Amino acid sequence: MPYVNIKVTNEGVTREQKSQLIKGVTDLLQDVLGKDPATTFVVIDEVELTDWGVGGVNVEEYRRRQS
């Protein structure tokens, strides 16, 4: 019973994109590991830019510094 948790920043990932991610990950686990899609769980969490850190700062600040 595979469980995959995908975390992305909350920047407008569409319902269609989420569906594609879920299907793609499920298919990959079936193809590579022989896992049953009926018992494969995929969860997508959207994280606010201020709640995701990189380089010691949140993503908003990190991007400001990069530009």
Walk through the language-model features, giving the residues of each.
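A domain-level signal for the structural core that forms small-molecule/cofactor-binding pockets
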Residues: P2-S67
